[in-house]
């Protein structure tokens, strides 16, 4: 990364509560914008929408969403930020993430 931070903000229609369809959609979008940016920012809960069925849709930190995001970050050499429905034990919540191309992971 140089002296200028190039950011891509992505906002799209989602397929309600369909992680796989939304991950596929974002993968296609990423293939067109990477190389021209340093940071990609996804919307809140981009894989499911802001669903109230959190128990059914939540996943662990090493689940499908973060696994895909880490792969994209590494393959496209871009940092990626967003959030997803996370599970920690019996608790579910909206967890923010920031994944760097070197594999560094940051959560809040």
Where is each model-derived feature located?
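Cys-nucleophile CN-hydrolase/nitrilase-fold catalytic domain and related Cys-dependent amidase chemistry
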Residues: 19, 27-101, 106-107
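Active-site-proximal beta-strand elements of phosphoester/diester hydrolases
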Residues: 4-14, 18, 95, 107-108
């Amino acid at each position: 990364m140089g002296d200028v931070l190039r950011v891509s903000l992505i906002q799209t229609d989602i397929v309600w509560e369909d992680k796989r369809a939304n991950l596929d959609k974002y993968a296609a979008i990423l293939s067109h914008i990477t190389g021209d940016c340093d940071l990609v920012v996804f919307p809140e809960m981009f894989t499911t929408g802001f669903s109230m069925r959190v128990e059914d849709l939540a996943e662990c930190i090493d689940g499908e969403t973060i696994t895909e995001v880490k792969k994209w970050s590494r393959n496209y050499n871009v940092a990626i930020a967003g959030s997803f429905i996370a599970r920690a034990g019996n608790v579910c919540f909206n967890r923010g993430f920031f994944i760097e191309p070197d594999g560094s992971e940051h959560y809040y």
